Amino acid sequence: MSKVLPKRSDDYSLWYNELVKRADLAENAPVRGCMIIKPYGYSIWEKMQAVLDKMFKETGHSNAYFPLFIPKSYLSKEASHIDGFAKECAVVTHYRLKNDENGKGIIVDPEAKLDEELIVRPTSETVIWNTYKTWIQSHRDLPLLINQWANVVRWEMRTRLFLRTTEFLWQEGHTAHATKQEAIVETEQMMNVYATFAQNFMALPVHRGIKSANERFAGAEETYCIEALMQDGKALQAGTSHFLGQNFAKAFDVKFASKEGSLEYVWGTSWGVSTRLMGALIMAHSDDEGLVLPPLLAPIQVVIVPIFKTAEQLDLIEATLKPILAALKAKDISVKFDHSDKYSPGFKFAEYELKGVPLRVAIGARDIENGTVELARRDTKEKTTVPQEGLADTIEKLLQEIQENIYKKAFAYREANTFVADDYTTFKTMLDETPGFILAHWDGTPETEEKIKEETKATIRCIPLDVTSEPGICMVTGKPSAQRVLFARAY
């Protein structure tokens, strides 16, 4: 198969789909809308998991696991919550198959109908809050800070690998608190954890903000979010954190005895990120040659490709590299020494470029004589010849520079593609001619928000917390507006 990718400028969607497949990240599964995450793609997700899990534990959270199947009656206890997910729920109605009487296959056994249908987990608030009813009795049981790593199912109609799939992997945090203020602090803290992860590890600049009522999570009183801009000018929601108030506590009768002895409902939060982050990572940084991975999340940070003609030359290269490989390992730098003779060095160069390996080292017989190696950066494609002496230190410094440069490039793109619109005509022109984030005034009503969405396909991504904005007048109605909000067309 040709490794030449479609160009982003020609067909961004095709470029993305082809890159995911050709870089061996994922492929479509037999069940429509599901995906198979391949080893290379899963290794990136594992690195994300490891970093996030450490951050969660540093903020006092513990991991647990709750069932995949949820009794249908649980979902009906929180009306606004089920309204938000009803159309996406997969339902289990029977528990057994049997052979067809004609001997031509298997069928669902009609006698094995469940007394109560089970919902395949679209999210776990209901089953977790039903459990919290037995776990929480006293103020001494609070705060309860739980996270789970799991798969969920939402029956999506329009799917795309990593970005929107019927089944996806994620983490979901669910916490319970004695006071409203503690729960709000937790909600904001987890939004900030996600933003720190996105910026420091994914090299992805994000806006922190609050969702409008129309875009709020079903069952939440407030939804905080982080929003990123992809290279085609579309926004992507990279993480959400929800202040649930006492909605789920009241629905599932979760009370605690306060220090004063009175019975009170707890306050809740939930928050999550998913394999959608993989899509964000790919679309934010990659180019027409393939993936561009930030070193902190790259499964292979450095690949060493020896250039040799004889076994003796390879032996000499391996002997030269032995202390260098040991030094890199001591620095916890992930390195692959690809000395296989199945493919030419040129093929390997192209393959590792496609897979986004941040730094490539080439070493041949002449380099051995000169005491040098050639380094090639994936982010800038710059090649340099450097001494073998102190190479591990050189590589360590260069990986830090690459991480920072990838972020700076993404930040510069976002800033160059963030616009201000003062009237609706300009707003619509910007959406069509210069896609990106648009800061504009909105009167705060769901009706105006829905009108904009219907007419332009743009949504309020968030009411930004990190953008200074003055009061003004709504670009559509002319009514007063407290501040500019962030609009974009989005994934």
Curated annotation (Swiss-Prot):
Main location: cytoplasm
GO cellular component terms listed in the entry, alphabetical order: aminoacyl-tRNA synthetase multienzyme complex; cytoplasm
Keyword ATP-binding: yes
Keyword flag Cytoplasm: yes
SMART domains in alphabetical order: ProRS-C_1
Assigned EC number: 6.1.1.15
GO biological process: prolyl-tRNA aminoacylation
Record text on subunit structure and interactions: Homodimer.
Family: Belongs to the class-II aminoacyl-tRNA synthetase family. ProS type 3 subfamily.
HAMAP family, per the entry: Pro_tRNA_synth_type3
Entry text on domains: Consists of three domains: the N-terminal catalytic domain, the anticodon-binding domain and the C-terminal extension.
Name of the protein in question: Proline--tRNA ligase
Organism: Cytophaga hutchinsonii (strain ATCC 33406 / DSM 1761 / CIP 103989 / NBRC 15051 / NCIMB 9469 / D465)
